[in-house]
Amino acid sequence: HGHHRRQRQMCIRDRSYPTKELVSLANSILSAVNDQNFVDIATQVSSALWRGDSVTLDEISSSYFATTSQVKEKLKTGNEIRNGKGYYFGSAYYYEKELYWGLDRLPYLEERLTELGARKKSENNEICALNLKAPKTLISEKKVNLYYYPSLNSPYTFVSTKRIREIRDEYPINLFMKPVLPMLMRKMNIPTNKAKYILSDAAREGRRYENEMKIIHSPIGNPARKSYSLFPAIDKAGKGFEYIEALLKASFQDGINIGDDNFLENLVTNLELDWE
């Protein structure tokens, strides 16, 4: 029993964030590395940091070490550069006025560099290919439950609707709609740079998946509340997805105020439901 408890504790520890001491050591190392060696050293440091490998970090720090004041100045400069590029936290790439956050955005950067003729090798193999290909057929004895949490003010939600519809139509699933209140209506503070990035990133995703944003009219406030108030009855009638999809199209493509009574009445009527 004690052995299993120790194993669980080790698993929890292995999955936790690195300690502040190791983060400080990693920052010290990377602050002392020149641009030419940065990628190689950063790869070693990152791997050791997330393994909690203090021995490896100590070894690297014998060759690369910056004082506390040097690290502070380096981070200050880096944050200023990041802010100037319109971003709000780390782990993002920036190239020629376009930001790429996370591994699933690197294919965009690779495509762009390839189009510019920057690829060093002639092979066509993609380095950052996502390889996200759904099976042509999905055989299942029972339907799979898909829970969808749309937000009426989310550009990402809008972009996702086309693929959610395709999944619903082409695979054996039960689609359960779980609308959520927009972040701004939950008193969450969204930095300006974050809001700008979300909009530009979602627009990029929309172009990629052929569901582009065009004229935007934010539904924040009363329009969202009024629209959501009708949802339970419409969802009960089996038209919940179509209703949310139409609201998002109105907000992110057609520039329509979805709180307008005439719009809502027409929408409900078009869904072949009784407005009264």
Regions found by a protein language model. Give the residues of each.
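Conserved strand-turn element in the central/C-terminal portion of the radical SAM core barrel
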Residues: 17-18, 64, 147-153, 217-221, ...
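Conserved N-terminal beta-strand and adjoining loop/helix that marks the start
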Residues: 29, 226-230
